Amino acid sequence: MDLTLPLDYQAIERILPHRYPFLLVDRITEFELDKRIVGIKNVSLNERYLSFDGNGRAALPPTILTEAVAQVGAILILAKPENHQRLPFFAGIQRVRYRRPVHPGDVVEIEAVVLRLRSRMGLLKGVARVNGVRVVEGTMTFALGDTSKS
């Protein structure tokens, strides 16, 4: 797996099974195997899943933002050679805090850090920021399944 930075949308498609409109990561800018990763999500007015915040402005729903954080974390986990043929499953979220809405035109910087990694399960801490300000943070549990058919 080629992890020459920055990873663009096409390189990310070779790692994750997600496709448009559910692939929520546009670019990977930083990567340390088994430690941390930083990705970018550019929020556009053309997003299919925009909702409206309390002020009537278009906003990215918090659940979609959480999924974007999980996808960045999945790239970190799948980059490990022994996980190339595995499929990550989002198993749970803990202590998630949504700080402020994310609007079209925002560039979301997403960081995921490994807290614990075992052969089939793990825990990541994720933080998303816009202009250096935290917009969401929390920990995510994931499980790894095999893609081979028995």
Question: What kind of region is each of these model predictions?
Answer:
Residues D2-P6, G73-E111, V135-A143:
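Hydrophobic beta-strand-centered segment that forms part of the acyl-chain substrate-binding groove
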Residues D26-T29, Q94, R99, E111-L115, ...:
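Conserved positions in beta-strands of structured domains
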Residues L7-R19:
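Short aromatic-glycine motifs in intrinsically disordered, low-complexity regions
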Residues F52-I77, F90:
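Compact, glycine-rich, soluble single-domain proteins
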Residues Y20-L60:
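Catalytic strand-loop segment that frames the active site of acyl-thioester-processing enzymes
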Residues E13, G56, Y98-R100:
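Beta-strand-rich interaction surfaces with strong enrichment in secreted/lumenal proteins
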Residues D2-L5, P17, L33, V102-D106, ...:
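HotDog/MaoC-like acyl-thioester-processing domains
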